[in-house]
């Protein structure tokens, strides 16, 4: 009886506490017709998101109503836990835009298609993008200056000219702009072909970011349902503070979901590093190792940093990366994002360009993303350990679909569709490639002398440093076609394991695989087809491939351990991995799974939906 009463008392306390939390949580409203002197109720909304952010407390929700909000949201605090977070959301069914730009009028015609406008420097406040040079570690300027400013005509991003004389010429393929900052004013020249800019929508970058806290440790924030664009973001190398159009700034537990994010001078979404006095002064492997040690003393651990969720976003038109994160992305999930048109202007270059560029993807899951026209789709640079890259669709990426650079693993790459001219670029060890469709080239780096970290199990704690010989990779049950070629592994320095792979239409096996299934005359006739309900992959397969070889379901046990860290291939929570579903989530045949990412094909031509169209 006493035990029953005690249990009832505990349950009552829990219920009372939960109801108290619910009762204390508030919803604040923001609307274009509101006022920042209002109380934020539905009847008396604030006018700016920033005003609501100042009063919101853990557990509160900020609902923003339709309109364009030209402001930088700097959340002054975060939530207390995953259950008591601060949520910023667009009102259901309403289009809410947050922009780092301002509308500019009063353009004066100079000649032909060239116009100019002169603005007082106070228009920009403390930050002027037209005086802000893009620079930093591993940045390649191509012999000219680049600024974080931008000019948009009816939403179209003009290209920055290197010199004013270029803007004064007739408009070529790409319309140009040029800026000059004097002590009191900023003048912008721009080409507006066949239009009067005073009769069009012309916007210019003014703010460095759109949603970014000015200090680290603003945890447990949700940002949902917005269109966010136009940010004068800086170059974001792994050795500096990484500011994105939206960014988490060295915090924990953010959810960034169902947003449209575009038009960033450098980075769209940052899950990145804090800033310090060593920013952009560490352009070497040894210096980055020192950066890592400083991060460990600055709270880089499982309890403090990472655990973010970035899902169902559309990210485009960023000239460095769609998503970036140096050490701050650990233990995160990046899923179901459409990332495209990254690094398209190609006016500058550097070692940080990708759809997704992560340093230290420790226990990070990158799954079901659609990445194309991004230069490089995914780049796991240093410290990919416990990383899973699963069921991603990558094509039309000019550099490669996946680059693993100086990682020691374990990294599991399964059920992906890699269709770009180069599928894999491997300068690492400890990778497991399982049930992928690989149509492009595979580059294997024989040896890299850089000493890079490996970590204790499911931890940021550094266990040691090691150089990077090629090998210690596993390839099981993959479907190679066209340029897919495993022969670079014939001379790998470390052992490799291969089995159950199929090679079509000129794809080449490695001598390391004892019994590959070779079908040199089989044409998969592969191409993508857009339909109203999504994107489909059309290809030819043959059911006989199942019967011609016996394959087994790939598991933690069958993969063994990555050699250098001595760790198994398992999930972030430490449970065993079993590759028993395919790209679409269909159960694998437990007795003899089919090669490649699709488990139940039909012989001959078939259409497989690889991306489902859905409203945000």
Language-model regions, residue ranges each:
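Glycine- and acidic/polar-rich repeat regions and solenoidal domains
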Residues: 74, 81, 209-211, 233-249, ...
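Bacterial N-terminal signal peptides
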Residues: 11-20
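Extracellular polysaccharide-degrading/modifying enzymes targeting complex plant/algal/animal polysaccharides
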Residues: 27-250, 255, 260-262, 270, ...
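N-terminal secretory signal peptides that target proteins for export/translocation
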Residues: 1-7
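Boundary at the C-terminal end of the N-terminal hydrophobic targeting segment
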Residues: 23-25
């Amino acid at each position: 009886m006493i035990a029953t009463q005690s249990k009832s008392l505990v349950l009552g306390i829990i219920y009372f506490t939960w109801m108290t939390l619910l009762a204390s949580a508030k919803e604040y409203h923001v609307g274009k017709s509101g006022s920042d002197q209002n109380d934020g109720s539905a009847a008396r909304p604030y006018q700016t998101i920033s005003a609501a952010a100042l009063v919101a407390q853990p557990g509160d929700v900020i609902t923003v109503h339709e309109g364009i909000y030209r402001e930088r949201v700097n959340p002054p605090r975060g939530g207390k836990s995953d259950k008591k977070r601060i949520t910023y959301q667009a009102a259901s069914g309403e289009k809410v835009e947050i922009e780092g730009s301002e509308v500019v009028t009063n353009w004066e015609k100079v000649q032909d298609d060239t116009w100019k406008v002169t603005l007082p420097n106070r228009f920009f406040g403390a930050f002027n993008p037209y005086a802000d040079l893009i620079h930093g570690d591993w940045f390649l300027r191509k012999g000219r200056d680049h600024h974080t400013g931008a000019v948009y005509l009816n939403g179209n991003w003009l290209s920055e000219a290197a010199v004013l004389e270029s803007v004064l010429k007739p408009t070529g393929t790409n319309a140009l702009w040029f800026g000059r900052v004097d002590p009191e004013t900023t003048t912008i020249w721009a080409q507006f072909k066949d239009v009067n800019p005073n009769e069009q929508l012309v916007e210019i970058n003014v703010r460095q970011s759109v949603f970014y806290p000015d200090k680290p440790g603003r945890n447990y924030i949700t940002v949902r349902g917005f269109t966010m664009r136009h940010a004068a973001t800086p170059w974001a190398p792994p050795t500096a503070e990484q500011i994105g159009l939206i960014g988490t700034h060295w915090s924990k537990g953010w959810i960034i979901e169902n947003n449209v994010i575009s038009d960033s001078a450098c980075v769209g979404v940052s899950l990145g590093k804090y800033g310090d006095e060593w920013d952009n002064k560490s352009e070497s492997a040894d210096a980055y190792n020192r950066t890592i040690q400083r991060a460990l003393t600055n709270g880089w651990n499982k309890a403090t940093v990472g655990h973010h969720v970035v899902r169902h976003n559309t990210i485009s038109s960023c000239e460095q990366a769609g998503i970036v994160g140096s050490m701050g992305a650990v233990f995160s999930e990046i899923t179901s994002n459409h990332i495209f048109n990254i690094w398209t202007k190609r006016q500058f270059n550097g070692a940080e360009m990708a759809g997704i560029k992560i340093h230290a993807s420790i226990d990070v899951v990158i799954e079901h993303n659609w990445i194309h026209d991004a230069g490089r789709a995914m780049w796991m640079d240093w410290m990919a350990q416990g990383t899973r890259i699963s069921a991603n669709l990558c094509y039309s990426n000019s550099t490669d679909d996946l680059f693993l650079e100086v990682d020691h693993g374990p990294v599991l790459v399964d059920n992906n569709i890699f269709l770009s001219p180069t599928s894999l670029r491997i300068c690492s060890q400890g990778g497991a490639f399982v049930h992928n469709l690989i149509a492009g080239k595979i580059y294997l780096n024989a040896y890299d002398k850089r000493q890079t970290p490996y970590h204790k199990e499911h931890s940021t704690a550094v266990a040691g440093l090691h150089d990077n010989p090629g090998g210690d990779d596993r390839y099981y049950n993959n479907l190679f076609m066209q340029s897919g070629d495993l022969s670079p592994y014939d001379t790998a320095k470390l052992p490799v394991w291969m089995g159950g792979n199929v090679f079509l239409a000129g794809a080449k096996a490695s001598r390391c695989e004892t019994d590959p299934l070779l079908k040199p005359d089989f044409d998969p006739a592969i191409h993508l087809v857009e339909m109203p309900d999504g994107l489909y992959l059309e290809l030819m397969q043959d059911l006989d491939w199942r019967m011609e070889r016996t394959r087994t379901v790939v598991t933690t046990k069958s993969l063994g351990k990555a050699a250098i860290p001595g760790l198994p291939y398992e999930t972030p929570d430490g449970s065993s991995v079993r590759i028993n579903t395919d790209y679409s989530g269909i159960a694998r045949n437990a007795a003899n799974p089919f090669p490649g990412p699709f488990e139940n094909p039909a012989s001959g031509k078939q259409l497989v939906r690889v991306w489902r169209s859905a409203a945000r």
